[in-house]
Amino acid sequence: MNLTRREFAKANAAAIAAAAAGLPILVRASNLVTEADVTSLVWNKAPCRFCGTGCSVMVATRDGQVVATHGDIKAEVNRGINCVKGYFLSKIMYGSDRLTRPLLRMKDGKFDKQGEFQPISWEQAFDIMAEKFKAALKAKGPESVGMFGSGQWTVWEGYAANKLFKAGLRSNNIDPNARHCMASAVMGFMRSFGMDEPMGCYDDIEATDSFVLWGSNMAEMHPVLWSRVTDRRLSAPQVKVAVLSTFEHRSFELADLPMVFKPQTDLIILNYIANHIIESGAVNRDFVERHVRFAHGAEDIGYGLRPDDPLEKKAKNADKANTWSDIDFKAFAEFVKPYTLERTARESGVPAERLKALAELYADPKRKVVSFWTMGFNQHTRGVWANNLIYNIHLLTGKISEPGNSPFSLTGQPSACGTAREVGTFSHRLPADLVVTNPKHRETAEKIWKVPAGTIQEKVGFHAVQQSRMLKDGVLNVYWTQVSNNMQAGPNVMQEVLPGWRNPDNFVIVSDVYPTVSAQAADLILPSAMWVEKEGAFGNAERRTQFWHQLVKAPGEAKSDLWQLVEFSKRFTTDEVWPAELLAKAPELKGKTLYDVLFRNGQVDRFPASDLAKGYANDEVDAFGFYIQKGLFEEYAAFGRGHGHDLAPFDAYHEARGLRWPVVDGKETRWRYREGYDPYVSKGSGVQFYGYPDKKAIAFALPYEPPAEAPDQDYPFWLATGRVLEHWHTGSMTARVPELYKAVPDALVYMHPEDARQLKLRRGSEVKVVSRRGEIRARVETRGRNKPPQGLVFVPFFDANKLINKVTLDATDPISKQTDYKKCAVRIELLNLA
């Protein structure tokens, strides 16, 4: 058998993915032929549906179904490679329990909160939704309605939802599930640089000498990027890899400097590195003097718990968490001076020689460094601080905004950047880094959206965790979720999430593809189209915006989230949802539907259906009579063009494998803030952090503070949650792929063998994991990929039959409002020895 190099690479990649899923050799080799003229397949590009890496795949369709996918060899991100999840993308839409009709809880032919789900029409679904929304708005105003969205929304779905709630219904109670994963990264960027999102790109991987992973298991969570890191490490002898985590995982296999630290002490390690840089004379004085100023952040800021919690009452600055005062470099140096090597080794548990070697990676002026982090940093009661502290290190050394020198926050969802952050679907944000609390920002949005001045409320809406609390307390009464599964993914679900959803005064709508845990707890389920059943756009972790066409039809009566949002807007007139004083400013809008005002406004509807590329279906174009995706995108792009968030024209993205913003004069930007790469940086300045008026970044003096909950005599173990390679988030897609489910069918309790021995457990024992909030049953694993130190257990959250978030604590970072899923106290109880 003679294979070309390309054929061998494709066969090898397929074999690796199949082996990971436990497939036999014959099946592995059965679909290596991909040529369209041989197979009668039609191939098109699309970004992968899973993580924030943003891999591009080629999607094969035949007879109205997706039948195969493979890595896109033209894609800069993944270069033809996929991870094991990506290789099974063709199966995620075809689970046997796919939702295809709206379902309402009913008894005796009417809605009943305690009734059974029965199929209804879309007309009936929108009837009861409109009834519930209008009743709540009339009785209690905009604060009584809300929406929980997603970093998996397409760009235009998130944008339409943002408009509908913030301008149409005048409620800022819209927040994405990205609050649980990226909010601390957002606030870290905003505080340090005055603008959100990374300054670097994936090209840094091939340009650097050092990789430092902080709370990031890239080998399993970003495996395609990890393949590039591995290639760089193995092909260049000077390259070093440091990995820091609270437990050992697969990324440690490549580590030159492996470090397992005690939970929360990453703050101490970060301050020690800054101190080492200063004490050893490694500060890049010229860079710091020209480009950095210093500030002391508020301390003792609480833990984002309910106001009556003792920890919140005790905190001195819970209401001033995001404040700071200016200091100088000398004061900053004095602040970090107590974070010595000896103290850091003692309190973190990391050997001193490894800590010093890590600090010297950063301090060495001849060595380039890329710092990667994900949920270990962000899901942290001091996650914003952790982000600020890593920026301190890169700013002190000047190792930033240039090839191979980059602090890089990796995202977990395919459009947490593109939709949640850039579109501004958080409860405090508007597109392009604008915020609802700023009058000028509201004015900008109102002008672009062509709504009267004063339409957008200045009060920040309820964030994700607060939404659950407000549902429970009866403040929030009508709640719509799309592309999210918060009943499984939210923290402390039994005490703070489920009670609000089942509160008889509340009405909860879930739009989803499968009957998830959240869907089963709802009152109304709306069947959604997914991935290539609709035209879409995602924005990945390196600011790359990627488009795809609709390639197949959704099954049954399933509809895209965009169609649901826009069609539902027809059910409201301005008279029903806007006060008289607002309508008096724009009498021409009186009596019009929100659909007319928001989506038939002369901007969104200005592109005719004929603009759609030939040969592609588009159900929303058919439904509304114009190219709504193009209209929404171009209106949204107006927020950022000329302001450092420039997006290319709509049609350019269908031709490219994504473009990294800002895109100016057709050219994408790889490194922001650096002259020669970023068009917004003035000639001769070298570097400009133009998010702030003085074009300087801020280095923050921030201390170590303890976690909200720690092990004690009654609950002697730390619990950390997270993911595994084969599953994505709550498993609602991957658990329906037989090969992935077979590979990892159950969530396990990973623990140290000595802890198991002392508790008289063994591998396979069934145990209870118990906290002050709830408990689950699962089996013990003392071997395998995750190796916790003594005193810590790790349980992934993909398993709908083992809801580990019954156990977790709903403490959040007080600045970002992001949940800490990595640190709470539990005990382990034997149920069955096995």
UniProtKB/Swiss-Prot annotation:
Signal peptide: 1-29
Example of a GO biological process term: cellular respiration
UniProt KW Transferase keyword: no
Localization annotation: Periplasm
SMART domains per UniProt: Molybdop_Fe4S4 (SM00926)
Gene Ontology CC entries for this record: membrane; nitrate reductase complex; periplasmic space
Residues annotated for substrate binding in this entry: F797
Primary localization class, coarse: periplasm
Gene3D superfamilies (UniProt xref): 2.40.40.20, 3.30.200.210, 3.40.50.740, Dimethylsulfoxide Reductase, domain 2
GO terms assigned for molecular function: 4 iron, 4 sulfur cluster binding; electron transfer activity; iron ion binding; molybdenum ion binding; molybdopterin cofactor binding; nitrate reductase (cytochrome) activity
Span of domain 4Fe-4S Mo/W bis-MGD-type: 41-97
Pfam hit, one: Molybdop_Fe4S4
PTM text: Predicted to be exported by the Tat system. The position of the signal peptide cleavage has not been experimentally proven.
Keywords: 4Fe-4S, Electron transport, Iron, Iron-sulfur, Metal-binding, Molybdenum, Nitrate assimilation, Oxidoreductase, Periplasm, Signal, Transport
Catalytic activity: 2 Fe(II)-[cytochrome] + nitrate + 2 H(+) = 2 Fe(III)-[cytochrome] + nitrite + H2O
Needed cofactors: [4Fe-4S] cluster; Mo-bis(molybdopterin guanine dinucleotide)
SUPFAM superfamilies to which the protein is assigned, alphabetical: ADC-like (SSF50692), Formate dehydrogenase/DMSO reductase, domains 1-3 (SSF53706)
Binding site for Mo-bis(molybdopterin guanine dinucleotide): 85, 152, 177, 181, 214-221, 245-249, 264-266, 375, 379, 485, 511-512, 534, 561, 721-730, 805, 822
Function: Catalytic subunit of the periplasmic nitrate reductase complex NapAB. Receives electrons from NapB and catalyzes the reduction of nitrate to nitrite.
Protein name listed in UniProt: Periplasmic nitrate reductase
Organism: Pseudomonas aeruginosa (strain LESB58)
